[in-house]
Amino acid sequence: MPKEVTMKRSLFEIEKNIPLTKDVFEMVLNGDTSGITNAGQFVNILLDGYYLRRPISVCDYDEGSLTLIYKVVGKGTKAMSEMPVGTNLDLLVGLGNGYDLSRAGDHPLLIGGGVGVPPLYNLAKKLVKEGKKVSVILGFNKKEEVFAEDSFKKLGCDVIVTTVDGSYGTKGFVTNALPESYSYFYTCGPEPMLKAVYNATTAEGEFSFERRMGCGFGACMGCSCKTITGYKRICKEGPVLRKEEILWEK
C-alpha cells in the first residue's frame, strides 16, 4: 500500500528550468522534500499574481531535490517557464495518494501519454530498484513532442515510443503497442487515452487522473470523479485509482 500522505508547505529554490520540447519544461528545485512519500504524488505551486496554485506531478525526488516536468498551457505555466535560477517558490508537497508498488508483480507495464509521462519516472526508478522487469510505453502526437525516452532507458527499462502520426517510433496510440503479457500496469495521461487503456487491457492496473483543481487537498470538491463506491476527490483519494473502481462518465 502507498505510505500515509503528509502534506507540507515549504519554500523551494529553482536550480534548473530548461525546455525539453517547444512547450514542455524541466524544473529542478531545492528544498524540503520529506513530505513526498509515494511515486505518483503531486505538488501545488503558488505563483505571484495568481489566486489558485498550479498542481504539477512529481517526476522525481530525493532528499533535498525535486524534479518537475510541466507543459506550458496558460499564463501560469508560461510564467513558470520564464522563471530564472534562484527564484523561490512556495510549494505544498506530498499531495495525493500515489501508486501502490506492492501490486506490481515481476513484470509491470507503465503507460504514459504526453505530460502524463513524468510521474511514471520515479515509479519506474523504484520498481527497477526492487528488481522488477519494467516495460514502458510512451505516447505522443509527433516526433517533436517526444521526451524522457532516454531517461527511462538509462534506468534499464524496455521502452516503446508511439506517435500518432508515425513520425517517430511505432505509429498509432499507446494501445497499439501493448505487449501480450505483463503482471500489472500503471498509466497516466489525458482522459481519452486512459479510457482507451481501460478498454484494451485485461490485467489489473492503476490509473492516474489529470484534472483541473481548486484547492488541491480535498476541501473544494472541484475535482471529483465517479467510482463504484461514490465520488472521490482526485486531489485527495486520487489522483491514482484502481481499474476496478473506475466508472467512466458517458
Language model region names:
Residues 2-87:
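Ferredoxin-reductase
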Residues 51-58, 96-103, 235:
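Short, Lys/Arg- and Gly-enriched loop/turn segments at beta-strand edges
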Residues 75-212:
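FNR/FR-type flavoprotein reductase catalytic core
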Residues 119, 210-239:
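Local cysteine-cluster metal-coordination motifs and their immediate loop/turn environment
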Residues 16, 60, 161-163, 207-209, ...:
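Structural signal for conserved beta-strand scaffold positions within catalytic alpha/beta enzyme cores
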Residues 239-250:
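Short microdomains enriched in Cys/His and/or Lys/Arg
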